[in-house]
């Protein structure tokens, strides 16, 4: 019981009571922790303001958008003021605006001293929120560290994407592969991993190759994830 009182959980599914109001969902959950009603009431007011749902206090849950339900589920997980909050895929299914609002709320929790444990398939989410992360493949840990340290260890500084007309890439694949320390030839584009994007682009053009489009970007955690786990879809 003592450990549970310091722990908050946000499941992947928003298992809220659809027939109850936003306020009543939080009140009922607070009672599970045997908190006095006065304490719960004060906490609800704080949490609704924190997750930007104050004006939805009297609304039934089934009238809320997906993003609002997700924020309410997080508020519910915080009702007992936990020191540790566990979140399972916190932004799955949300639009970009709702995701960024949620990230902002979670970042503020970190600033307040709450420890977050997050499972996610969104690498940009892990890069935004995590101080330390574990990448797993087939139930095994394949890498561990801070987002920046993993990127520096497993990916060169930049990635250049070259797109060629249909049928051309297959013919020039071998020539492309030797123009950077590491490369990937995909169905629709070639990815060249390099520490100097401009130099790599110059090498490609010097070879007489004429891509339709060229995109240079910094390496990301997603590049690391794909390198360590592969691009083949697995169950």
Please report, for each region that a protein language model flagged, where it lies by residue.
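Conserved catalytic motifs of ABC-family nucleotide-binding domains
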Residues: 81
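ABC transporter nucleotide-binding domain
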Residues: 103-195
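Hydrophobic anchor residue at the start of the ABC signature
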Residues: 74
